[in-house]
From Swiss-Prot:
Domain tRNA-binding: 39-148
PROSITE patterns (UniProt xref): B5, FDX_ACB, TRBD
Full protein name: Phenylalanine--tRNA ligase beta subunit
Organism: Vibrio vulnificus (strain YJ016)
Listed GO biological process terms: phenylalanyl-tRNA aminoacylation
Cofactor needs: Mg(2+)
Gene Ontology annotations for the cellular component aspect, listed alphabetically: phenylalanine-tRNA ligase complex
EC number(s) on file: 6.1.1.20
Tree of life domain: Bacteria
Species lineage: Bacteria, Pseudomonadati, Pseudomonadota, Gammaproteobacteria, Vibrionales
Protein family (similarity comment): Belongs to the phenylalanyl-tRNA synthetase beta subunit family. Type 1 subfamily.
Cystine pairs: none
Keywords: Aminoacyl-tRNA synthetase, ATP-binding, Cytoplasm, Ligase, Magnesium, Metal-binding, Nucleotide-binding, Protein biosynthesis, RNA-binding, tRNA-binding
Gene expressing this chain: pheT
Length: 795
């Protein structure tokens, strides 16, 4: 919200400086972003009257004028502006004046004619207004008055960054209320008297969606002069709030928007067929907006229509077909309350953002419409003339918001603020904020005013009391709190432990968006319908993610495009799975995922720069799983996944249940994502790996361990893990470990076969094993794998 300090002080004028005022506003929770002067630095400029204006004898584009600036003699000034003419009131820089840029005005001759000053344009005085030629002031502008005083240019614009909950401050009225409360100062509102109707013309109004539009006011004003010029005082107020002047009708509705906080709209009455109908749009209905763009409407969009077509997207943007033009004679003024829930998000869905939608989305004072209509009518008649008809009002009282009644406990107030504020001060603060307050045994009950949609819970009242009392007035003190020991179960694996492990192995933690591009997600997780957001941040972030892999792959691409080819990332986060039986129809499951790409190690003269492969990531995943202290509980089983290479992917299985996947990204997916080179990923359900077996202390065997190596030949399709597991199944009490240490394919091994070398460790806790014990265990293992897999011992 950008506003002029001088305009604010017309409503409330506390005895504080500009710096003190902006500090007050900031400390009250309305952060001031910027304070800027409304015009450049200049002096010596006066209001003048062009008494004579004639053609320069030697220059076609110059005019010779005599200007009255309230001195004894008229000033001779040569001017080149096309709009310079006799009778004009102008801004005159007299001799000795200094304009922005340290430009000094001196006596001069232009093509032989004396010039003792300069007639100024807005730009020449450092005023940001688009205009051709010199300024044209009001005919009643006092001659000789200092121009800075005439336009009140000793003023600043204050830009406040309002939070979304403080919609009540999107106006001079709202800011004045706030400043008045902070300074215990009275707020003087402009007098708004009802405008008496002079004609009986009305337009029929029907509201078919009362929940979305509980109140709609319409008023016909005929014989309006849209060619009238917006007064300079209004243009200046609009300019200082960041709005340029367009035409008097639009300027008036914008003025009421800024002053009162009530968005309004004006229709060309001649372009309305039949009457006004406020309804929901038909799916696919089209409307051409005032900016010339065409919008295809959704069925949940509220529109203001006539009997044949949509005239405007309600509360957001007017339509071109019904807009006021230079040919307009009669207008229909609209002033309505549109429910925030029915406006919120609609503008964004059409790529629009307007001052009107910003206010309606957050909530407009629902008691403001009548006075705003009268204010706009009075200004329209004053500036453009016209004949006024009665106001037609359609209201659904049952659908209007009800004031929130909120209880505030004394104990809660003291606990949250950490300071005791006297009861009388609490009541005074709440009443100054426009609330009705009732004292109870436990504290108070406050009824929020109609302009405060954000007062809903007890903490809201605590915040209001605290910020108006002044955070600076609350003494500093150390927080007092009871320390509670965290309940930590030894069987739980803390997430921090896994994070530390991966960081120690060279990974960086990533945090990606939970919102993803839906079509891209279908490449990674085909066949599963994701939740599509009704009001997404953008089209590229319109679906809830079904897993973490998509976000990590996009992060790899982002890094590779910035000359960072070696990437090791992991992420912990939620995936969102639609489920009819889950709460709110959605399962939120914590997941752990990781990705590697590029070289195995950083570039070094003494290290080979080999590219990462499947087994690099498999080793990292095994390190995570080994935190469970039960290496026999998990396994990797060859499996296919639509996002992974069919020959380089596996399911991660724990206790017989598939809990994740690991593998190299499918070449086709690699191409579509724009990945540069081999990329390997994993994803695991966190809830399946965050528990561990509590280790038990056992005595170490004092007897020697024995190692026997066997090499078995099996089909290439047989997984080595299955062979190792088979060894453990029949190894008996003496077999302590079976480890694969070599895989060989080539000379001496039949084509289509492979040789697996396995180290068997045998040991007894009670005695030294005899050769017969060892041989018996080895023979049993060989026989079992031979029978189960058709394996044979390699010669």
């Amino acid at each position: 919200m950008k506003f002029s300090e001088s305009w604010l002080r017309e409503w409330v004028n506390p005895a504080v400086t500009t710096d003190e005022l902006t500090h007050q506003i900031t400390m009250a929770g309305l952060e001031v972003d910027d304070v800027l002067p409304v015009a450049g630095t200049f002096n010596g400029v006066k209001v003048g009257h062009v008494v004579e204006c004639g053609q320069h004898p030697d220059a076609d584009k110059l005019r010779v004028t005599k200007v009255d600036v309230g001195e004894e003699e008229l000033l001779d000034i040569v001017c080149g502006a096309a709009n310079c003419r006799q009778g004009l009131k102008v801004a005159v820089a007299t001799v000795g004046a200094v304009l922005p840029g340290d430009f000094k005005i001196k006596k001069a001759k232009l093509r032989g004619q004396p010039s003792h000053g300069m007639l100024c344009s807005f730009t020449e005085l450092g005023i940001d207004v688009e205009s051709d030629g010199i300024m044209e002031l009001a005919i009643d502008a006092p001659i000789g008055m200092d121009f800075r005083d005439f336009l009140a240019l000793n003023d600043v614009t204050v830009d406040v960054d309002l939070t979304s909950n403080r919609a009540d401050c999107f106006s001079i009225r709202g800011m004045a209320r706030e400043v008045g409360v902070l300074n215990r100062a009275d707020v003087t509102e402009p007098s708004v008297a009802p405008v008496a109707p002079s004609i009986d013309d009305t337009v029929a109004i029907e509201v078919k969606a009362p929940a979305a539009c509980p109140r709609y006011l319409g008023r016909v004003v005929k014989n309006v002069n849209v060619q009238a010029k917006t007064p300079l005082w209004m243009q200046e107020k609009l300019r200082r709030c960041g709005i340029r002047s367009i035409d008097p009708v639009v300027d008036i509705t914008n003025f009421v928007l800024l002053e009162q906080g009530q968005p309004m709209h004006a229709f060309d009455l001649a372009k309305i067929d039949g009457g006004i109908v406020v309804r929901l749009a038909e799916q696919g209905e089209k409307i051409t907006l005032l900016d010339g763009s065409e919008a295809e409407l959704n069925a949940d969009t509220l529109v203001v229509a006539d009997h044949n077509k949509a005239l405007a997207i309600a509360g957001i943007f007017g339509g071109e077909e019904s807009g006021v033009t230079s040919e307009t004679k009669d207008v229909l003024l609209e002033c309505a309350f549109f429910a925030p829930d029915h406006i919120r998000g609609r503008a964004r869905s059409y790529g629009l953002h307007t001052d009107s939608s910003m206010r309606f989305e957050r909530g407009v004072d629902y008691a403001l419409q009548v006075s705003a209509m009268e204010r706009a009518t009075a200004l329209l008649v004053e500036i453009c003339g016209g004949e006024v008809a009665p106001v037609v009002a359609v209201e659904s009282e049952a659908e209007l918001p009800k004031p929130n009644k909120v209880a505030l406990r004394r104990t809660k107030l003291d606990n949250l603020l950490g300071h005791h504020i006297a009861d009388s001060d609490v009541v005074e603060i709440l009443e100054r904020l426009g609330m009705t307050v009732e004292t109870t045994a436990e504290g108070w009950v406050a009824v929020a005013p109609t302009w405060r949609f954000d007062i809903a819970i007890e903490q809201d009242l605590v915040e209001e009391v605290g910020r108006i009392y002044g955070y600076d007035n609350i003494p500093n003190q150390n927080p007092a709190a009871a320390l509670k020991m965290h309940d930590h179960q030894e069987a739980n694996i803390p997430l921090k432990r896994v994070r530390d492990l991966l960081v120690d192995r060279g990974y960086h933690e990533a945090i990606t968006y939970s919102f993803v591009e839906p079509e891209q997600q279908k490449l990674v997780v085909p066949g599963v319908d994701a939740l599509i957001l009704p009001n997404p941040i953008s089209a590229e972030m319109s679906a809830m993610r079904l897993g973490l892999i998509q976000g990590l792959l996009n992060t790899v691409v982002h890094n590779q495009k910035r000359q960072q080819p070696r990437v090791r990332l992991f992420e912990y986060g939620l995936r969102f799975i639609p489920c009819d039986t889950a709460e709110n129809g959605m399962r939120q499951e914590p997941m752990l995922a990781g990705v590697i790409a590029g070289t195995r190690s950083e570039e070094h003269w003494n290290i080979d720069t080999n590219t990462v492969d499947f087994f690099d990531l498999k080793g990292d995943v095994e390190a995570i799983l080994e935190l469970s202290a039960n290496d026999k509980a998990y396994s990797f089983v060859a499996a296919k996944h639509p996002a992974l290479h069919p020959g380089q992917s596996a399911a991660i299985v724990v206790d017989g249940k598939e809990i994740g996947v690991i593998g190299t990204v499918h070449p086709e997916l690699e191409r579509k994502f724009g990945l540069n080179g081999r990329t390997i990923v994993f994803e695991i359900e966190w809830s399946a790996i965050n528990r561990k077996v509590i280790p038990e202390a056992v005595a170490l065997s004092k007897f020697p361990a024995n190692r026997r190596d066997i090499a078995v030949v099996v089909d290439e399709a047989v997984a080595s893990g299955d062979i190792v597991n088979a060894c453990l199944e029949v190894g008996g009490e003496f077999l302590k470990a079976a480890k694969l240490f070599d895989v060989y394919v080539g000379k001496g091994v039949e084509e289509g076969k492979k040789s697996l070398a396995i180290a068997l460790t045998l040991q007894s806790n009670e005695r030294t094993l005899e050769d017969a014990d060892i041989a018996g265990a080895v023979d049993a293992i060989v026989a079992h794998v031979s029978e189960k897999f058709g394996a044979s011992l390699r010669d």
